[in-house]
UniProtKB/Swiss-Prot annotation:
There are multiple copies of the stellate gene in fruit fly, encoding proteins that are extremely similar, which makes their individual characterization difficult. Thus, most experiments probably do not discriminate between the different members. One of its GO terms (molecular function) is protein kinase regulator activity. Interacts in vitro with the casein kinase 2 alpha subunit (CkII-alpha). The relevance of such interaction is however unclear in vivo. The gene is Ste:CG33243. This is Stellate protein CG33243.
Length: 172
């Protein structure tokens, strides 16, 4: 982070501002700090200090290199919570994740999906609720698919069933 950037910025602000990270939503600090949400994440207490620190200073030696992974794993948990689903719902309605490239889906909004819940297996894809297919996103993103997981679209549409679209032409 350059010295010209806002000194009140956190690692999270910096990370969410990186081109290609627009699929991610902001995980609230109280959710990140809740020890229940940290269960099973190794070294999280050390990385938590870096993630929540008001100013990024890579020269301080406080960056561990795993911040992206740990934020991504907390993000995957958060988007399954009520607050997380609401945040992702807003992004879905705005079309932040893109639209289905299948012409018969009539530019149906898509959701991010990971092909695996295991970190490092694949990058994020987009899932069309109409044709039920996964595609490479048009946006320039290299986010790990584990930040969303393979079950996110199913959870999203089971909690918000009125958003699913039939395969017929919506213009008729």
């Amino acid at each position: 982070m350059s010295s010209s950037q806002n000194n009140n910025s956190s690692w999270i602000d910096w990370f969410l501002g990186i081109k290609g990270n627009q699929f991610l939503c902001r995980v609230p600090t109280d959710y990140v700090q809740d020890t229940f949400n940290q269960m099973g994440l190794e070294y999280f207490s050390e990385i938590l200090d870096v993630i929540l620190k008001p100013v990024i200073d890579s020269s301080s030696g406080l960056l561990y290199g795993d911040e992206k992974k740990w934020y991504g794993m907390i993000h995957a948990r958060y988007i399954r919570s009520e607050r997380g689903l609401i945040a992702m719902h807003r992004k879905y309605l705005r079309g932040d994740f893109g639209s289905c490239p299948n012409i018969s889906c009539y530019r149906q909004n898509t959701l991010p999906v990971g092909l695996s819940a295991v970190w490092g297996k694949s990058t994020v894809k987009i899932h069309c609720p109409r044709c039920k297919s996964n595609f490479h996103p048009k946006s320039d993103t290299q986010l790990d698919g584990a930040m969303f997981g393979p079950s996110f679209p199913d959870i999203f549409f089971s909690m918000l069933p009125n958003l699913t679209s039939p395969l017929d032409d919506p213009r008729t």
